[in-house]
Amino acid sequence: MASDNSQTQTRTKKPRKKRKTYSCGVCRKFKTRCDFEPLVGKCHRCNVLRLECSLTKEREEEILAAVESTSKSTLAPASLVSGQLPALAAANPVVANDAVVVAPVAATLSSRLNKLESSVGSLNSKLDLALMLLQGSNSAISNLKNLTSSKAGMGDRNATYDDDDDGDDDGHDHSDSDNFVNGIKLQEPPLKLISDIDERLFPTKAQSQQDILAKTQRPFVVARFNFLKYFNQHEQLCLDLSRDFLVKSHFWIIPGGIKEINRTYVEKHLFITSVFTIIAMGFDENNKYEKEQEQLYPLVERFLTNTLTMFEKLTDHDIEAILYCSMFNISRKSKRHRQLKFNSLVLCNFAVNSVLNIVDFHKIKERVLINEEYSALDLYHLRILNSLTACRLQYSIGSGNFTIQDDMLKEFNNLTAKFPQANFGDDIKISEINLGDIVNGIFLNFKAYFKGFSKRFRAETRGHADRNRDCLVIPELEYWLKNWDELLSKDGGGVLLFAYDFYYSMICRSFLTEFFEEEFQNDVVYFKCALKTMKRYCFSLLDGFLKLPPSLIKGAPTITLHQLVYACLTLCDFLHCFDVAERQQVLNLCTKIYWHLNTIGEKLNEATDNVGKIIKSLIDTSKRKAQVSGRLAVPRNTKRGSPSMTPGFQQSVQSSSALQGSKAGSPQSARSVNSQGSGADSLAAASFNMPDVAQFNSFEDFFQDFFDNLKPTTQSMFSTLQQQQQ
């Protein structure tokens, strides 16, 4: 019985409770002190001696808890460097070499290490950029930017954060929209601070009665006083002329502007009122306001020339006035000995810099894209900037001063499309800027562009029997035409197509004049295609101008009339390359332009004067060419693949540059082109006068009378197509 009880006690005896150990196996074996370090994952002794520690597995939960509790604080650079950085540096060799720490610990430490490396790399990049800026090395800065972007991309690919690490961010979430609007206008740039100090040391405030009197003699103050006096004497005239300008030119100027002004507006904005008035004086025929214009011009000239000294104090209306001075003539051609001709490109550049100085477009961009605020004042400032940008591009291209366009400025130009109150005119401005930017880009690298264009043209037309019928196709312009097709279909005035035709003809003419000896001299087919394309778009430009409503033409900017004259001049310079029928078309169309400008009230205008001289040059040039060769000999390819040009054709094409002098209205200037005509013929051409349009009821009567008064030898050049066969 006793034995049974003892067996039962043996079976029911509880197992001995295992004593909790706080030391690792190595420390227990050598009976040494064991201090466990959770962030390291080992005890102090094993860590120093680089031994495997049993506590790494036994206290896994404690290790993870310690890492997680310190993760948030370790993201701060100061705490990371001062506290946990040594621990991490000591832990990494163990993790890498011994592979003892389990996967969750390794992932956490790896994540934190990636964040640390990314932060340090960004800091190094910024320090390097600062050093490069101090050294002034542009190439190094460019390389550094590329290096920074590549490092940023690598950091993004290497960073593999767990879901538990979302709280480890620095709290700055940069979205794409934030990066798009992170530009600012500095509130305290260095030169502004220096200028403020200068104003404090040398105040502009008048201290004495003598200073007050001297201040009233400042040029801009005198100009304001004198124009206000002029306005008081001619108040109704100024108001009426300002209304005429705003009504007639509203299609070309800032969209959505005012149509009428009053005395209150005039007193606040004297400069722009004077510009309205003097431009409108040029719209009327027969020098109706010649006396008033002579009195007003010195006042406007003083306003305009003193804007440089008023740069910091210019208002948005002042800059708008400078815009109109660059778009329209404020001086009269007949008074050029006294009234200056201002450089429109210089005025545009100054106005663009001025508006960027007084308006914070970065704030406008932020309000539009982030806050979705669409104020009327912001739209007004953006419209001024867009009109200035379009005008500057037109004059840059027209004068051959091609410059790289600022990407930031392009972003500002596109902001008007975001406004719900934007209208059709705003879309036209954006389209004009886009077209000008495309053409400007072509001319910036014109030599390389032409070589690539010629190579593609020959590759596409090789083996085609009808190469002579092809017109050149400039893909960049065709892309623009397709991209803005919907807007062009709604453009009743055809203004955009007018600019499109001008740029097409300008590029083709530049091909012929700049690269004739390199390319066209040995490829007659290529030359004829370029010539045909140039003629096609010159004709399209002139036909489009004839279709414009008179109300648009009367208020058109000078650049538009310059484009018109350029088309006539181009046809004149290359007239000897056309056949008889084409010559007659050129003469007929240019004469119709002259008639149209006169009948819509543009008498005594610079465009009518130039077109009239060009028509006279057309006649004189054609007459001499007929006397030299009897008819124009069109060269042929002697053998496929090896085109050759006759000496007469080569000489006639090269002579087109000599005819540039004809645009000055002097037919004798073209006599250097092997002219065999008599002196009497030249004198007759020089003394030729265009008939008075007012004497005729229709263009047909005007042209017939004009044609009947030509010499018989000149008539025979344009009469019939059969003359070409003689």
UniProtKB/Swiss-Prot annotation:
It is found in: Nucleus. Keywords: Activator, DNA-binding, Metal-binding, Nucleotide metabolism, Nucleus, Transcription, Transcription regulation, Zinc. Residues 152-183, 629-681 are annotated as: Disordered. SMART domains: GAL4. CDD domains: GAL4. Residues 161-170 have a biased composition (Acidic residues). It comes from the Eukaryota. Its main location: nucleus. GO terms for biological process: nitrogen catabolite activation of transcription from RNA polymerase II promoter; nucleotide metabolic process. One of its GO terms (molecular function) is DNA binding. GO terms for cellular component: nucleus. Residues 24-53 bind DNA. Residues 640-679 have a biased composition (Polar residues). Probable transcriptional activator involved in uracil catabolism. Belongs to the URC2 family. This is Uracil catabolism protein 2. It comes from Lachancea kluyveri (Yeast).
